[in-house]
Amino acid sequence: SEVCFPRLGCFSDDAPWAGIVQRPLKILPWSPKDVDTRFLLYTNQNQNNYQELVADPSTITNSNFRMDRKTRFIIHGFIDKGEEDWLSNICKNLFKVESVNCICVDWKGGSRTGYTQASQNIRIVGAEVAYFVEVLKSSLGYSPSNVHVIGHSLGSHAAGEAGRRTNGTIERITGLDPAEPCFQGTPELVRLDPSDAKFVDVIHTDAAPIIPNLGFGMSQTVGHLDFFPNGGKQMPGCQKNILSQIVDIDGIWEGTRDFVACNHLRSYKYYADSILNPDGFAGFPCDSYNVFTANKCFPCPSEGCPQMGHYADRFPGKTNGVSQVFYLNTGDASNFARWRYKVSVTLSGKKVTGHILVSLFGNEGNSRQYEIYKGTLQPDNTHSDEFDSDVEVGDLQKVKFIWYNNNVINPTLPRVGASKITVERNDGKVYDFCSQETVREEVLLTLNPC
């Protein structure tokens, strides 16, 4: 069966839209009136109060919408609403770095229902966004190449539908943890995929299986660039889910949203932070997260690393292929940006057991102390590790070394030093520091360039 609506056309429940393994139920989307898609415009001129737009040239021209700016649509997901703070917070961060038409798309009329129905209603949302983009183009001469659609959860697939309906002419779609149930493993027609825009970038933060882990996000790659921060499954600062018994996804409602969805919501928090940290989310190409954490994927290759989030489109090789996978670590709360460094320490002095820590000092900032090695400290041995600093130090000027040995009282007061410390940044730039001194336990040793 099918339903047809003015402006938007017809919607069927034929395969692959329904009646396939991933979507066994034959369900049609609700009417546009019931889904009630709304376009809430924020601009640099009205940062705190939106102007509600409709896809009508006179309404658009009488608003603060400007033809000489990019337009970024932000589409929320299941249970959510367009007036939720996170959408306008992304707009507010954007206003700090650019002039932009920032349109928060509200479809709470269609998102606050059972999940299976909501996953059909996004077809209407995608069609409404596509129609809006078509009106901009046909009535106002505004090119889809100035349009970027950002979608979270089900909103990612609504963005994909908008892109499919505009024949891939939209400049960019960003998927923030695209929803897994009813979408993972389905044909491209139904879900977000790289053909939906000229460039599609995706952040996966909740990619554990829905059963039994309740991971809402897809593990499947669906973009040109797919980022898996912290491995993509368990985000630092999110509690492990104790709802590991199987929950009927159609029975999840608002009270459990933050609790169930901490990992799932991290994706838009990372995006918001990335706007203000243009180099704080470098993603490293790597075979797996385990290989990445084993320090085998550093530094960035010669073409550089893409930045997860807002500046992913600056990566020269962004559309050289689909399903290009990248890994990185983030912080655990509010300031999520991190800068990865590799540090190698060549020891001198006595042979003892202990820990060695190093801190970095640069023209843009200083890092805290990071442990590089613990175990037997043997002169002339070199130990290396990588760490993710919450400070970008810039050009390195000096490093400081310290060691301690776990409260084992050693009456000989041994002295240990670092004859050489090498620091490598993610762009491959290497800095060497040397010292001929040794120090007692818990005494800082400063090494200068050599």
Curated annotation (Swiss-Prot):
Cysteine-cysteine disulfides: 4-10, 91-102, 91-104, 238-262, 286-297, 300-305, 434-450
List of glycosylated residues: 167
Stretches assigned to the PLAT domain: 339-450
UniProt-recorded Gene Ontology molecular function terms: all-trans-retinyl-palmitate hydrolase, all-trans-retinol forming activity; lipoprotein lipase activity; metal ion binding; phospholipase A1 activity; triacylglycerol lipase activity
Entry annotated with the keyword Chaperone: no
One Pfam match: PLAT
Subcellular location: Secreted
A GO term from the CC aspect: extracellular space
SUPFAM superfamilies: alpha/beta-Hydrolases (SSF53474), Lipase/lipooxygenase domain (PLAT/LH2 domain) (SSF49723)
Record keywords: Calcium, Disulfide bond, Glycoprotein, Hydrolase, Lipid degradation, Lipid metabolism, Metal-binding, Secreted
Catalytic-site annotation from UniProt: 153 (nucleophile), 177 (charge relay system), 264 (charge relay system)
Catalysis performed (reactions): a triacylglycerol + H2O = a diacylglycerol + a fatty acid + H(+); 1,2,3-tributanoylglycerol + H2O = dibutanoylglycerol + butanoate + H(+); 1,2,3-tri-(9Z-octadecenoyl)-glycerol + H2O = di-(9Z)-octadecenoylglycerol + (9Z)-octadecenoate + H(+); all-trans-retinyl hexadecanoate + H2O = all-trans-retinol + hexadecanoate + H(+)
InterPro entries in the record: AB_hydrolase_fold, Lipase, Lipase_LIPH, Lipase_N, Lipase_panc, PLAT/LH2_dom, PLAT/LH2_dom_sf, TAG_lipase
Keyword GTP-binding set for record: no
GO biological process: cholesterol homeostasis; fatty acid biosynthetic process; high-density lipoprotein particle remodeling; triglyceride catabolic process
Residues at which Ca(2+) binds: 188, 191, 193, 196
The EC number(s) this enzyme carries: 3.1.1.3
Activity regulation, free text: Inhibited by bile salts, is reactivated by (pro)colipase/CLPS.
Subunit structure and binding partners: Forms a 1:1 stoichiometric complex with (pro)colipase/CLPS.
Function of the molecule: Plays an important role in fat metabolism. It preferentially splits the esters of long-chain fatty acids at positions 1 and 3, producing mainly 2-monoacylglycerol and free fatty acids, and shows considerably higher activity against insoluble emulsified substrates than against soluble ones.
Family statement drawn from the similarity comment of this UniProt entry: Belongs to the AB hydrolase superfamily. Lipase family.
Protein name (record): Pancreatic triacylglycerol lipase
Organism the protein comes from: Sus scrofa (Pig)
